C-alpha cells in the first residue's frame, strides 16, 4: 500500500512538472513571470543571450494610485570574484495601470548604463528581462533586478542566471559561487588614469581608526582595461573612488544575511553608485574613444538596435489604440452633428421645411395669404389643414372667357346677337 501511495505521489509530481510552463516569483509589491530562470550561450558562436519574461501584479498587489513610477536596478553578481555591480538603471515615470502588467505604456523612460556593461540590457516593457549582445565568459553570473516603486518603502528583488561557455578554452562557468576565501578588499575598477584621495575606514576588534590614502590608477593595455585595487575595507562597505570609477561590492554570506537577495532587500533607497551611471543617449552621442574603452561602435549599434524595441512597441500602441480611438470619436461627432442639425431644422426652421407658392390672382382672404406665406410643416395635423380649407374657399380658376371679353370683335358680335334677340 505504501508503495502504491509513493508511486501515485510521484505520478502527480511528474504530471505537475510536465504541465507547468512558467515560473512566477512573488514579491511584496509585484511579481515576475518567466519561462526559464536561466539561459546559456556558447562563446564565440552565439551572438545574443536573451531571457524572456515580464513583471506583473498579482492578487493583493494592487496599486493605491492610478499612475505610478519606479526604478529598476540591474545588478550583475560575478561568481568568480564574489562581488556585485550595478550595471544599468531604468527609471519609469507616469505609468498607468494596464490590467496586471507592470511598467507598460509609461509616459517617460530613462535608461543609464555603466560603460563596461553597455552590451547588457533589460527592457521589461517589451518582455525582455535580460539581453546580452555578443556574450562573453565574463558575462556569466547572476543578474538581479531590484525593483523600487516610488510609493513603496521597500524594494523587490528578482534574479536570473546566465552561463557563457568558452569552446576555445573548454571551460564551464561555475553554477554557484566558489568556496575559496576571497579577500573583501578586492575590487575591480575600470576607469581612465586619474589621481584621487579618499577616506577609508578600517575596523578592528578593538579600535576603529580612519586613515587617508592616496592612490593612482594607471590604465594598462589588458583586455579588460581594469586595474586591481587592494584596500582594507569592512564587509559590505560601499566605496566610490573618483568620479567615473565603479567598484565591485564584495559580499560574503553569513548567518544573519545568508544570500545576496536578502542583502539587497535589506538596503533602503537607491544604491549610491547609481549617480555614476551615464544616460544611454549621452553615451551614444559620445564620439571620443577615450570615454568608452571597452565598447566598440558595433556594440553601440547593437545596443541601439536592441533598445529600439521600445520605440517599436510605442508605435504599435499608437497604431492599435490612438488611431482607432480617433476614428470612433470622429464618427461620434458626425452622428451628434446630424442629430443637432435635424433638431434645429425641425423646431427652429419650420417655415423653411415646406413651402407652397401659388399665384395671387383673385380675391384671397387673410387666412389664405397667411397659410401661403408660412405653409404647414410636415408635422402639422390634418385638423389644422381642414380648418384652413373651410375658412378660406379655394380661389376659382381663371377661365379663358376673360380673355375673349377683352377682344373687340367678340364684343361686337355679342351686341349683334343681343339686338337680334330683342327684335325677335
UniProtKB/Swiss-Prot annotation:
This is Envelope glycoprotein I. Residues 379-388 have a biased composition (Polar residues). Gene3D superfamilies: 2.70.230.10. Keywords: Glycoprotein, Host cell junction, Host cell membrane, Host Golgi apparatus, Host membrane, Membrane, Phosphoprotein, Signal, Transmembrane, Transmembrane helix, Viral envelope protein, Virion. Disulfide bonds: none annotated. Glycans are attached at residues 35, 67, 78, 121, 131, 236, 307. Residues 1-22 form the signal peptide. Residues 341-424 are intravirion. Pfam families: Herpes_gI. It comes from Equine herpesvirus 1 (strain Ab4p). It comes from the Viruses. Interacts with gE. In epithelial cells, the heterodimer gE/gI is required for the cell-to-cell spread of the virus, by sorting nascent virions to cell junctions. Once the virus reaches the cell junctions, virus particles can spread to adjacent cells extremely rapidly through interactions with cellular receptors that accumulate at these junctions. Implicated in basolateral spread in polarized cells. In neuronal cells, gE/gI is essential for the anterograde spread of the infection throughout the host nervous system. One of its GO terms (cellular component) is host cell. It is found in: Virion membrane; Host cell membrane; Host cell junction; Host Golgi apparatus membrane. It is a single-pass membrane protein; Single-pass type I membrane protein. Residues 192-223, 287-306, 377-408 are annotated as: Disordered.
